[in-house]
Amino acid sequence: MASLSSNLKTLMTSVHINASELARRTGIAQPIIHRLSTGQNTNPKLATIKPIARYFMVNISQLIGEEPLPSDQSPQITGNYRAWNRVPLISWKDATSWPEALPHYQTSDEVMYISTDANVSKLAYGLIIQGCAMEPLFPNGTTIIVEPERKPKDRDFVVVRLQGEPEARLRQIITEGNDRYLKSLNPELEKLEVARLAQEDQFLGVMAQAKVDFLR
């Protein structure tokens, strides 16, 4: 019976790509692709191999060797990858040390990735909103895509770390003259939060996209 590593090598060879290119096209980190193709990781997470199977248009059982690879047709790949990027889903705490925390996410098999068609850099990441401060526009559980390379402008939604706080938060930035303020959105809060931006506060990125899943 074929193994995951041998099947992966066969599939990459059939479409003339290497591990680096497969990583670029699927969003799976190159070191992880390397460990899979060399047999160093024989028990990967489903979230790791699912994008690979989708890219090569095979099912999971075929990819890992439980079923034979299709032999009655030419090798196929999905053509949908070109318009999409995949970014790591990180914690609000890790957002405060991004991109220094990036190497951990690039080498971990536990990382979840989310797809986006937003025009973002390789340093972009995803966060899941917690709490009701930004409702009704961004309800609890909304996934946001954050671009750390973009400078914020008036009315942008930004991820920011306030002085002395261990985690980041999402707020809207309001500019009035030379002053800038951070605003929550929920009108049902006892006190709508509008805080003047202090010099010690740290911008961590601008929200590029928000995604809400209604079926969980």
From Swiss-Prot:
GO terms for biological process: negative regulation of DNA-templated transcription; SOS response. Keywords: DNA-binding, Transcription, Transcription regulation. Residues 8-63 form the HTH cro/C1-type domain. GO terms for molecular function: DNA-binding transcription repressor activity; sequence-specific DNA binding. One of its GO terms (cellular component) is protein-DNA complex. Pfam families: HTH_26, Peptidase_S24. Residues 19-38 bind DNA. PANTHER family: LEXA REPRESSOR, LEXA REPRESSOR-RELATED. This is Uncharacterized HTH-type transcriptional regulator CBU_1416.
